[in-house]
Every structure is written in C-alpha cells, then in structure tokens.
C-alpha cells in the first residue's frame, strides 16, 4: 500500500480517504506500483465520457457490441452511483459528449471506427445550433441520467469528435475551475474513456479510472474492455471499482 502525502495540510478525513481507496483496490500481482489517488475537495472532479443512448440504451446503435459488457459490469448503475455521490457531496461533474453534425460526414479520410460510426449514424445531430430530433435520439443522454446531467453542478463541455478531449474544451473548463484531479468514467472503455485518460495525463492532471463504470465493444478476436483495463493499469494513477470510489468520495466530504 502506498499512501501519497505530498499535501501536508490534508485533513484527517482526506488522509483516511486515500487509505480507503488504496485498501479497497484489487490486489495487484503485475509488479507495477500503485501510486494511489486521494480525493481532495475543491481539486477533484468526476468526468464522464459519452453517457449517451447509442452506447447505453438497448435501442442504441452500438448496443449489439457493447451491451454484454455494459450489463456484466453494471455500467449504467455504476455511473449513476458516481453521479449521485458527486452531487450529494458537491463535487463538480464534467460531461464530455460525442456529437456528429452533417458537416462531419464529409471528412475525406477516417479511421476504422470513424467510418463505422458515420455509417450507422452514431451520435448524429441535425445541426450544431439545433436540437431538432435530439430528444430520445442516440445522441441524447440516457434518460435516467438526465436529472444528473441537468444538475446545476454539472458542466457539459463542447463535443469531442473522434475519441479524446483534444477537440473540445474539457481541459479549459477543468482548469478554469481549479481542478487538478480527475475521477474518470463513461463510455467506451478503450476508445473515448481511454483517450480522455491519456490526454488528461499529458495535460498534467492526476487521473484515476473507475473500472466498472465503463464498458467496451466485444467482437470476434477483439475485447475492447480487456484492452482498456491493461492500459488503465499502466497509465492511470489508480484504478478502483465503483463501491470503493463512492466510499472515498463520501469520506472526503
């Protein structure tokens, strides 16, 4: 167990939170260090990627490949639990959505999943300045999340376009609110969630990932969730499940 104590002014509650997160993390037999993650009020935020119907609703266009992973992880319920814990304690929440507008379908070259997403109309919206047809669409929020996302404590960023936050204003919004520590969750694990983890790390944020508050596509010979877990472990400061993370959030406030 490694407890970070680089902030000498931390309260006992915050120190206890860091211990709690470390103690409830799965035992590691991979030989890698676990730097840990302390939840510090005022510096820590919850970031949720793509909490939208196309990933999380059985009617979504990606459900056929992600649904089994979503259900196995309890992803919908776990993201909800994180939203609730954040709002109950006043922790700021940032949602990074994925939208495609008509002009995005005119790109001259694309990667494999960009081609697929555009082909199946994933996250499509009619116009950047219109919400015509948005309600209940694949680009809309999962219905049960709307009270959380419409909450006064939630900041919805501009949309990212491929996978990472390089194409939206998430980093700006975090910095403008003095956030330096990120609890990351959302969809999908090896794509937008992992890409957000990587870029936020590069931008100097401390990032932990909630391993069962995400999920990924499973295809013949390809397991996006397993791939993501490997990279979460190798890159993030800490990986923990929802129960441990919620307990840590509540203990810190």
Task: Give the predicted meaning of each segment.
Residues 2-13:
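Bacterial N-terminal signal peptides that target proteins for export
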Residues 11-22:
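Bacterial N-terminal signal peptides
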Residues 28-45, 54, 88-89, 106, ...:
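Active-site-adjacent betaalpha module
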Residues 42, 60-86, 90-92, 97:
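A short alpha/beta connector and helix-capping loop motif
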Residues 49-65:
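Short, conserved active-site loops that position catalytic residues or coordinate cofactors/metal ions
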Residues 96-99, 187:
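Short, well-ordered beta-to-alpha junction loops that form the rim of enzyme active sites
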Residues 101-105:
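Short catalytic/ligand-binding loop motif for oxyanion handling, primarily in non-cytosolic enzymes
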């Amino acid at each position: 167990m490694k407890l970070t104590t680089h902030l000498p002014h931390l309260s006992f509650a915050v120190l206890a939170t860091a211990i709690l997160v470390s103690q409830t993390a799965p035992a590691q037999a991979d030989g890698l260090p676990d730097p840990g993650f302390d939840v510090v009020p005022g510096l820590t935020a919850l970031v949720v990627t793509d909490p939208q119907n196309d990933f999380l609703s059985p009617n979504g266009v990606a459900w056929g490949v992600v649904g089994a992973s979503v259900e196995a992880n309890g992803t919908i319920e776990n993201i909800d639990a994180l939203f609730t814990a954040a709002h109950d304690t006043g922790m700021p929440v940032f949602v990074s959505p994925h939208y495609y507008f008509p002009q995005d379908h005119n790109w001259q070259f694309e990667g494999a999943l960009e081609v697929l997403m555009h082909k199946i109309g994933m996250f499509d919206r009619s116009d950047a300045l219109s919400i015509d047809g948005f309600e209940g669409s694949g680009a809309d929020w999962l219905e049960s999340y709307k009270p959380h996302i419409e909450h006064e404590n939630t900041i919805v960023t501009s949309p990212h376009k491929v996978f990472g936050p390089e194409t939206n204003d998430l980093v700006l919004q975090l910095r403008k609110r003095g956030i330096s520590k990120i609890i990351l969750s959302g969809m999908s694990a090896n794509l937008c969630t992992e890409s957000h983890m990587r870029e936020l790390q590069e931008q100097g944020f401390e990032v932990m990932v909630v391993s069962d508050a995400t999920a990924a596509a499973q295809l013949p010979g390809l397991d996006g969730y397993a791939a993501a877990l490997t990279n979460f472990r190798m890159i993030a400061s800490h990986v923990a499940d929802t129960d441990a993370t919620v307990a840590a959030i509540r203990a810190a406030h």
